[in-house]
Amino acid sequence: MVLNLIIPQEWNILPCATLQVELLRIIRAKKKSDLTSAGVVGYYNDVVAESMDFFDCLWFRKLEDTSKEPDFHRYSLMIVPMVPSSAADSDDSSSCSECDSDALLSDDGPCSTCDECHDSDRYELSSDC
């Protein structure tokens, strides 16, 4: 499974893994609260963009951009590979997928044993970047 993102070229100055993790975090937060990934606002490298659905992609369109489709001289495609999380394979979501501890306090908080943070989504970012 992959998440196809169209992002402003200016965001490519950030390390790939950092940007992927941050975008995934804000997309998940929006989807969790509003059940949609459209309307996510990202601000990186002095560029503000809001997500909108564009075919099979999530396009982070710059706020000042009024075009109906992305200009790939100003935007680039970021493919975020996703893998099923180990926590998703288990029916017991109260244990930590990082250290197998039962001390995980909540799905979206840090484990009290290894201090790793968790999200309740069933997919996580692949290590490919």
UniProtKB/Swiss-Prot annotation:
Record's compositionally biased regions (Low complexity): 85-108
User: Where do the segments described as Disordered lie?
Assistant: 85-110
What is the top-level taxon of the source organism?
Answer: Viruses
Q: What name appears for this protein in its UniProt entry?
A: Uncharacterized protein C3
Q: Which organism is it from?
A: Microplitis demolitor bracovirus (isolate Webb) (MdBV)
